């Protein structure tokens, strides 16, 4: 007979405890000097709006790193085309010079040595063509190593940013509890996408994902491999930004819904107060 009131008291105590904990909690991913107190209610519009702003800020930073990766891939493609043109030109010069040298040497008995001048010019042209090819290959190796360092820095930065976002999402899902299931599912989907990207960087990075092998370091195959890896990493990060965009849209709709309901409640209270003045 006395169990029902006891359960009610426990439920009220649980709500008060959760509300009190929410008042004192902060977003852990903001860092020192940037922590902000959360709203009084776990599902209030102010708390959702604050979390949405934080999420959009972190999403923008992550998207900026994706743009940097895409720019690196474009630079590698332009470098590959220039190297291809230089190699074709160098090979053509080498072939032309070698042909001229052979013709000059073969005609030297007939021309009494005059064609040796043509042979010398041909050798010079062949040497110049070889120099162009070697210079192009060295430039390709140097640019590959430079772009590789940039990609490694971007990957490390993205990994740190995704860990911050994951801490925010874990905090949000924990305090969302059994509230809006659709919003909670969007948060979990975003967490899964971020976890997959972090594992993608850590797992493949430890096995040479971003570092070409020494056997491939001086070949043109390594550039194509590096470009493919960069594109794969960018696609993985874009899946994270897509999941964060979906969560942000859900947050925006919930904020608007909460705002409308709170306005309607305030209007109803004001109408009741005005009606009470006449009685």
Swiss-Prot record:
Taxonomy of the source species: Eukaryota, Metazoa, Chordata, Craniata, Vertebrata
Subcellular localization(s) per the UniProt record: Cell membrane; Cell junction; Cytoplasmic vesicle, Secretory vesicle
Similarity-based family: Belongs to the apolipoprotein L family.
Gene coding for it: APOLD1
Signal peptide: none
Gene Ontology CC, one term: transport vesicle
Transmembrane segment boundaries: 83-105, 122-142, 192-212
UniProt-listed Pfam families: ApoL
UniProt GO MF annotations: lipid binding
Protein name: Apolipoprotein L domain-containing protein 1
